[in-house]
Amino acid sequence: LMDDGPFDKNPHYVRLSTPKHAAKRTGLENEGFFGIGVKQGESYRFSVWARIPEGENSARIRVELVDTKSMGENHDFAVSQVVIDSKEWKRYQVIMKPTQTNPKATLRIFLEGTNAVDLEHVSLFPVDTWKGRENGLRKDLVQLLADLKPGIFRFPGGCIVEGTDLETRYQWKNSVGPVENRPLNENRWHYTFSNRYYPDYYQSYGLGFYEFFLLSEEIGAEPLPILSCGLACQFQNDDMSAHVAVEDLDPYIQDALDLIEFANGDVTTEWGKLRAEMGHPAPFNMKFIGIGNEQWGPEYPERLEPFIKAIRAAYPNIQIVGSSGPNSEGDQFDYLWPEMKRLKADLVDEHFYRPESWFLAQGARYDNYDRKGPKVFAGEYACHGRGKKWNHFNAALLEAAFMTTIERNADIVHMSSYAPLFAHVEGWQWRPDMIWFDNMTSFRTCSYYVQQLYSTYKGTNALKMTMDGKNITGADGQNGLFASA
């Protein structure tokens, strides 16, 4: 493994050289995430940055897609050779067409001949991606998103923004520019749970903020990026020394200002120019930005305040989303809401991962919210049935009831988003989730269909519905009746 590669943010590469023993071969193997799903006859683009470090003027590598469970004739079912013809770094690519469908293929690269080869940024992607984009997204997964007709798309997530520590927080500037020059980062969830340990689960940033903005545009949703406020995950970092001091927040605040410029700036600006170079000269017209995720305590508003001042001064039309903490009620929640009003946040993010009984009791939750303060963003929610960790109909029904509450109070609850959105059937952080997938297929849940119903058939006016002079809310002994019109 070498560390003087051609990309300053991603300098590591591997050198393959001939083994001394004639019966041995030098190579690399990548099994993907629970295998690599490929389909017979479809095209897959293999690419690699490579050079010859010494010796002759050409070298050759053999690229294989392999069924590791078979030692018969179909053991390798897609084979290509790539000739490396330069001592300077170049990108090489070849199209591979598997002769069989295999949900758990393995990619292998072998050195052929006696000349050493340096390899960097090895990639294998379907040619047939969403919108046909090179290194693009899986069509079936994005189509499910588009079919939801979403109004808002929050990215890159919640706790991943904070990081296990500040060093591993999500830094958007590392996720834009050429894909090969985006540095690897630890994934927030790869060892958090002892019963689900994925030591190779890292972020390559191949899906970065540019791709998120582009995806938002293509599915018709307003982008809502979330940035670090200088607090690492507070669940894992009790000591304030793990966080950025308020007086040292300037680089974090500048990141927020630069992101707005990247999304909306003219092509003559530094970050607007980069957006144009990546293929999108027109602005993305971003309207919202979130600062912090599930932060709590006085340390959060004292860090949020300078962000708000700076963003208001430079971009007064951008709406700022603050946080009400990780809980839907209690001391932290009750402390942060008045603070968000004091700071004049535009929206306050509330999160609800609660049991069925909680959702059943929320019919009147927003009836008495202050209409003069910040609006509500129900940024993460899902009904977690006790002892029923998978998606089930009763949970979806109660989520629908909660959405009726939101719809009836649309003057105060401006946005909502179910979470988590996607989960792989063999590697998930928790359950339930809206869309499940494996290496070949994807599956809608009952919660998905509820979200689709409400997003497709949006109301335009709320009519007051009463019984004996009281709003019909499902609360106050009304036996769980939820109504909206």
Language-model segments: which ranges?
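Extracellular and organelle-lumenal recognition/adhesion modules and their flexible linkers in secreted
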Residues: L1-S204, E222-L224, N237-D250, L257, ...
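Active-site groove signature of glycoside hydrolases
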Residues: F110-E112, D118-H121, P126, P156-C159, ...
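Active-site beta-loop-alpha junctions enriched in small/polar residues
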Residues: E112, F155-I160, S228-G230, I291-W296, ...
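Catalytic-core region of carbohydrate-active enzymes that cleave or remodel glycosidic bonds
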Residues: L214-L215, I308-R312, P316-Q319, W337-R342, ...
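Conserved, mostly hydrophobic/aromatic
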Residues: V48, K149, S216, L259, ...
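Hydrophobic, small-residue-rich alpha-helical packing segments that form membrane-like cores
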Residues: V244-R354, G363
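Structural recognition of the beta-strand scaffold that forms the well-ordered cores
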Residues: G151-P156, E222-L227, K287-I291, Q319-G322, ...
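Surface beta-strand/loop "capping" patches
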Residues: Q40-E42, N461-A485
